[in-house]
Amino acid sequence: DWTAEYCHALVRYNTILIDFARDTWGYISLGYFRQKVAKDEVGSSTMPHKVNPIDFENAEGNLGMANALLQHFAEKLPVSRWQRDLTDSTVQRNLGVAAGYILIALQSLLKGVGKLQVNEEAIQADVAAAWEVLAEAVQTVMRRYGIPEPYEKLKALTRGQAVTRDILQTFIDSLEIPASEKKRLLTLTPETYIGLADKQARDL
């Protein structure tokens, strides 16, 4: 039973790593991360210029193989016909196979992370264009001064819309709030506003 429990724990651990590999793959696709080029790597069979996130793809694949085996182990090992059959010994011989897949995946992840370079320009450009993130700050001030339906008003302004600086500042100018609060809101930018993120991160 303890082996089955251990296998289930490894499945959960591997699933977290799969999520990490997929997220990192996505950030590479978005251009938030660049990868250092290795001269001996083949980019693509048809696109020689391409730098594939191959290490993260390899890690994801190997972790998936490990999880398939571990899930079977966890379901099989507690079950025995009248507590007498020997199918468990066949299964136990393959515990090392699952461990091997995990080891290869970890090596791939470490190799992939070692190649990453942060593309600060791309990240800053996306943040600078995301004026809708300031809806939180505007809504908080609206609530403070008793303006009705602040959430609904900001939702109508921002949801599914391309929010620009001019659109948001026109909305702020229309609010019946003290001039000092208006001025404070108008000076906010997506790059400078972090809300309570700093405090919440430190409270962890």
Task: Give the location of each predicted region.
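Catalytic-core signal marking the mid-to-C-terminal active-site face
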Residues: 42-204
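Internal glycine-rich alpha/beta core junctions
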Residues: 1-76
